[in-house]
């Protein structure tokens, strides 16, 4: 299966929305934060209504299928993730969200209130929330003030973030002698 590296281009929009989805492509669910600490989703406090999750993980293969049924993987290098994260906020897209990438299900009263790129394996804030992901991972915190959306979180109908964006792709020629992870450490 072909693998493509995602490239941020100034001519493209980059990430312009982050959807709430049941099955995130990065295969990691968000956690919900209570007033005192991280708790199971079923016991979430109504007070804070914060969702914390990785948005993109560097060099993690993400399975895709195009309109013609061709299967392939994409990866986001660290430098692309950093540029996409910065551009997302620079363009003022922190209120752009929907359910399952459906433009008819645009969300109101949700905002990305915090975001960071993991830079430290020992002291990064993500560790406090139970995430053990590589440096270069983009994390975000969404404040949910919409009752209907919060109910979907509590019911487990949405479990993570998934980006919407426009990027260029560059095909990668993988060595037959090395595993995917070895080539992108």
State the predicted function of each range:
Residues 1-185:
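Signature of dsDNA virion morphogenesis modules
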């Amino acid at each position: 299966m072909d693998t493509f590296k995602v490239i941020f281009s100034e001519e493209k929009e980059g990430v312009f929305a982050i959807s709430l989805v049941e099955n995130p492509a990065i295969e990691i669910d968000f956690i919900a934060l209570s007033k005192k600490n991280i708790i199971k989703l079923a016991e979430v406090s109504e007070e804070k209504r914060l969702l914390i999750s990785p948005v993109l993980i560097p060099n993690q293969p993400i399975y895709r299928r195009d309109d013609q049924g061709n299967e392939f993987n994409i990866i986001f290098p660290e430098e692309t993730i950093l540029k996409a994260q910065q551009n997302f906020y620079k363009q003022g897209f922190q209120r752009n969200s929907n359910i399952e990438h459906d433009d008819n299900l645009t969300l109101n009263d949700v905002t990305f209130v915090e975001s960071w790129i993991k830079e430290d394996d020992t002291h990064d804030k993500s560790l406090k929330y139970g995430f053990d992901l590589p440096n270069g991972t983009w994390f975000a915190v969404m404040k949910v003030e919409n009752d209907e959306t919060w109910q979907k979180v509590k019911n487990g109908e949405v479990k993570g973030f998934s980006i919407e964006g426009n990027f260029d792709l560059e095909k990668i020629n993988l060595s037959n002698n090395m595993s995917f992870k070895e080539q992108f450490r």
